[in-house]
Amino acid sequence: MKFVLLFGVFLVTLFSYSSAEMLDDFGQADEDELLSLIEKEEARAKECTPRFYDCSHDRHSCCRSELFKDVCTCFYPEGGDNEVCTCQQPKHLKYMEKAADKAKKFGGKIKKWFG
């Protein structure tokens, strides 16, 4: 019985030591990965295409508005044969942003009344 108890304590100690080392390794890897993702996001944010500008070179480069990312929309101008692509905000997303803004303002008023 003493042998089983001693062996159990040894296994628990070994397991806790190995899991602590693994967590330290994962924590360091997560921090490094997070920093690299932030750097990539900052670099990508500088290269976005503003609304109503040409996005034919990269159709996924449109900038974000407050809540949603603009969409690269392509069309043929009247009487033209060349396709034109610009970053635009779809109407349904525009209305959703307006509704969210009004809800935010209304929430601020309620908070003022009861806060």
Swiss-Prot record:
Residues 1-20 form the signal peptide. Transmembrane segments: none annotated. PROSITE patterns: SPIDER_CSTX. The keyword Nucleotide-binding does not apply. Expressed by the venom gland. Keywords: Disulfide bond, Knottin, Secreted, Signal, Toxin. InterPro entries: Spider_toxin_CSTX_knottin (IPR019553), Spider_toxin_CSTX_Knottin_CS (IPR011142). Pfam families: Toxin_35 (PF10530). It comes from the Eukaryota. Residues 21-44 form a propeptide. The keyword Signal applies. One of its GO terms (cellular component) is extracellular region. It is found in: Secreted. GO terms for molecular function: toxin activity. Disulfide bonds join 48-63, 55-72, 62-87, 74-85. The presence of a 'disulfide through disulfide knot' structurally defines this protein as a knottin. Belongs to the neurotoxin 19 (CSTX) family. 01 subfamily. This is U3-lycotoxin-Ls1a. It comes from Lycosa singoriensis. The lineage of its organism: Eukaryota, Metazoa, Ecdysozoa, Arthropoda, Chelicerata.
